[in-house]
């Protein structure tokens, strides 16, 4: 029977999120107390995919007490991350297995979103269950993983808090030097982050993909929703404001709209096949179109992206505690014989949930948790926005006032914009 210390390998995959170092520290410190050896794989699966043991060793670090003892306060990740995807081929998966075996990794902890977890499970499926156990800690500032009891993903609270501060400053700026800011917020498929930042800061409008009734969104509809809101505020003497746009709007756009955003070419994708939403320049495209329509009214519009500056912020207290618990939960799950599982927190308890239980049978991928547009939370956020509602269009005096601000007749205004109440959920 081997007396060698079990080896725990840790890697981060996907984009950074506040709290990554907290998970690394939480897991490492507990494992070291158990007498395990802990190593960190630099840049996710990038070097493991090469299958070259010497290359992997050169990009692997021993995680010791001195290295991790105080890193839970820090943003970023000390072992770096990447979007390398071993699921691209069976050869890449076998390369990863080869390297894990060579380094005698018994426990494999991945920290990332659904792509990272899927990659880890696919690797483990080609190995004996007694040879390696795989656990993942779910991470994304998008908050779109289907965790139980509406538990947020780690990093979301920190990202929302910092995003709120940025938008709050833009709110003051927009009034001080009158203009509209169109703020594009990260969120690949869901609008949790955009809506959270907008509601917390009191932004005048927020548009998320979940509120559109049709399966596909048209660029023209998004333009007109913002345009009508700008005119409504202008009717009240306010030639300034802030509109927050979830970049996930792009994911739901029609092929016609996508070609417009990407300059009549196929949208580029990342190694996991996701559209590179940042390349769509949604806020800039909307700003350019709105200036054509509203420039004669003296409206100034400035596009702004909020995303990368949120990903490596130092975690707020909630995420610092949360991630430490997830790190502990991962090691506890290994000790209790779990594998192919995600570590989640439910009702104050950290526990493993089988990865397969979170999969969408239709796609084979982890289900996306969308914003519940029927919830009270969404209704509260909506009621404080300046968008034109069905009730507004029934108010003839208001319609006349807003139409006049746009130098239009009430009839022309209604014909152009009233249909939008059927485009989005009221």
Swiss-Prot record:
Name the catalytic site residues. 142
The cofactor(s) it depends on are: Mg(2+)
MF terms from GO for this chain are:
6-phosphofructokinase activity; diphosphate-fructose-6-phosphate 1-phosphotransferase activity; metal ion binding; phosphofructokinase activity
Activity regulation, free text: Non-allosteric.
* Extent of the signal sequence: none
Q: Where, by residue number, does substrate bind?
A: 140-142, 186-188, 247, 308-311
Please give the superkingdom of this protein's source: Eukaryota
- Under which pathway is this protein filed? Carbohydrate degradation; glycolysis; D-glyceraldehyde 3-phosphate and glycerone phosphate from D-glucose: step 3/4
Q: What is its EC number?
A: 2.7.1.90
What's an example GO BP annotation here? response to glucose
According to the UniProt record, one GO cellular component term is:
cytoplasm
Q: Where in the cell is it found?
A: Cytoplasm
Would you identify the family this protein belongs to, as annotated? Belongs to the phosphofructokinase type A (PFKA) family. PPi-dependent PFK group II subfamily. Clade 'Short' sub-subfamily.
Any idea what job this protein has? Answer: Catalyzes the phosphorylation of D-fructose 6-phosphate, the first committing step of glycolysis. Uses inorganic phosphate (PPi) as phosphoryl donor instead of ATP like common ATP-dependent phosphofructokinases (ATP-PFKs), which renders the reaction reversible, and can thus function both in glycolysis and gluconeogenesis. Consistently, PPi-PFK can replace the enzymes of both the forward (ATP-PFK) and reverse (fructose-bisphosphatase (FBPase)) reactions.
What is the name attached to this protein's record? Answer: Pyrophosphate--fructose 6-phosphate 1-phosphotransferase 2
Source organism of the structure: Trichomonas vaginalis (strain ATCC PRA-98 / G3)
């Amino acid at each position: 029977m081997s007396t060698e210390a079990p080896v725990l390998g840790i890697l981060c995959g996907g984009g950074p999120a506040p709290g990554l170092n907290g998970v690394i520290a939480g897991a490492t410190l507990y494992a070291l107390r158990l007498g395990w050896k802990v190593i960190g794989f630099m840049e996710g699966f990038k070097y493991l995919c090469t299958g070259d043991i010497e290359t992997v060793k050169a990009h692997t670090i021993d995680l010791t007490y001195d290295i991790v003892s105080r890193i839970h306060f820090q943003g970023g990740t000390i072992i770096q991350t990447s979007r390398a995807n071993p699921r691209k081929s069976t050869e890449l998966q076998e390369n990863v297995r080869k390297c894990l075996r060579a380094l005698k990794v018994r426990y494999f902890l991945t920290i990332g979103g659904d792509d990272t977890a899927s990659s880890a499970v696919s690797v483990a499926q080609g190995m004996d269950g007694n040879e390696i156990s795989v656990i993942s800690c779910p991470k994304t500032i998008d908050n779109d993983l289907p965790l139980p009891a509406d538990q947020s993903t780690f990093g979301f609270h920190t990202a929302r808090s910092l995003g709120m501060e940025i938008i709050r400053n833009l709110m003051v700026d927009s009034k001080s030097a009158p203009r509209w800011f169109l703020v594009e917020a990260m969120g690949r498929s869901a609008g949790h982050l955009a809506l959270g930042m907008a509601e917390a800061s009191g932004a005048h409008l927020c548009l998320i993909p979940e509120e559109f009734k049709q399966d596909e969104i048209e660029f023209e509809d998004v333009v007109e929703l913002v345009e009508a809101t700008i005119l409504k505020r202008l009717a009240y003497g306010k030639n300034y404001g802030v509109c927050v746009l979830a970049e996930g709007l792009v994911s739901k756009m029609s092929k016609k709209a996508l070609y417009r955003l990407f300059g009549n070419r196929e949208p580029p994708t990342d190694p996991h096949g996701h559209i590179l939403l940042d390349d769509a320049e949604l806020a800039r495209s909307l700003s350019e179109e709105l200036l054509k329509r509203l420039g004669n009214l003296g409206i100034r519009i400035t596009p702004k992206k909020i995303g990368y500056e949120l990903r490596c912020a130092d975690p707020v207290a909630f995420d610092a505690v949360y991630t430490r618990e997830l790190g502990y939960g991962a090691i506890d799950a290994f000790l209790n014989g779990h594998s192919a599982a995600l570590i989640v927190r439910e009702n104050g308890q950290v526990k493993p949930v089988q990865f397969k239980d979170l999969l969408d049978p239709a796609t084979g991928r982890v289900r996306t948790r969308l914003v519940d547009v029927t919830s009270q939370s969404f209704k509260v956020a909506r009621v404080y926005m300046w968008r034109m509602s069905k009730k507004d269009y029934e108010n003839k005096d208001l319609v006349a006032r807003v139409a006049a601000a746009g130098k239009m007749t009430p009839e022309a205004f209604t014909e152009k914009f009233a249909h939008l109440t059927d485009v989005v959920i009221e």
